[in-house]
Regions:
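ATP-binding/phosphotransfer module of carbohydrate and carboxylate kinases, centering on a glycine-rich
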Residues: 6-13, 35, 50-175
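Conserved catalytic-core motifs of eukaryotic protein kinase domains, centered on the activation segment
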Residues: 41-42, 144
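Small-molecule pocket liners
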Residues: 27, 46-47, 56
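A cytosolic small-molecule/anion-sensing beta-strand core signal
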Residues: 31-32
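Acidic/histidine-rich catalytic cores of soluble enzymes
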Residues: 1
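Short, intrinsically disordered, charge-biased short linear motifs at domain edges
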Residues: 42-51
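Short glycine-aspartate micro-motif
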Residues: 16-20, 26-28, 59, 132
Length: 175
């Protein structure tokens, strides 16, 4: 998050929420070019906000965490639950994006709804100048049109125009 805020897609914004969606879901909050850790060092930990009470079990012990709906492994698991054969996230999208079946359309629709609800909660609370998406799942192209539209549907303000941008520095920016 810090590298993107200082040198990447967020360099022209004062308040940046950096999102990581990959094997897990996490984030970082940058305020005026400084990382905000919070008192308990959990600021930005949106992957463990509850999206669905009594939802899917998370490794953290809680139920219904965002991570259990948005991470790459959760997407692959849900695909199998819908009756699809075990595939990687990349294989699912490559196989069905241009030739969708009923399972793929349901899988995609649920992901977009969950992405929209989860990220809009962050925007409603933090009200950042920009959100930068990173991690392997951020490479899904439909996040940048339909995903953003799903976020906008859930924002409190009908004037929201918070930029939701792909990262510029790649997955190794924090190294």
């Amino acid at each position: 998050a810090m590298a993107e805020a200082l040198l990447g897609a967020g360099k022209n914004y004062a308040i940046v929420f950096g999102v990581i969606i990959g094997t897990g879901v996490g984030g970082g909050l940058i305020l005026n070019r400084r990382i905000h850790h919070g008192r308990l060092f959990i600021a930005g930990e949106w992957g463990h906000q509850i999206l669905y009470p009594n939802g899917r079990k998370c490794y953290c012990g809680k139920m219904g965490c965002v991570e259990t709906y948005l991470s790459g492994p959760s997407l692959e698991k849900y695909w199998v639950e819908l009756g699809g054969k075990p595939l990687s996230l990349e294989e699912i999208i490559e196989s069905f994006e241009h030739n969708p079946n009923v399972e793929y359309l349901k899988w995609r629709k649920e992901y977009l709804a969950n992405f929209g609800m989860a990220l809009s909660n962050v925007i409603n609370i933090v009200d950042p100048d920009a959100v930068i998406l990173g991690g392997g799942v951020s490479n899904i192209s439909f996040l940048y049109d339909e995903g953003i539209a799903a976020v906008r549907e859930n924002i409190f303000s009908n004037k929201d125009d918070t930029p939701i941008l792909p990262n510029k520095l790649g997955d190794s920016a924090g190294v």
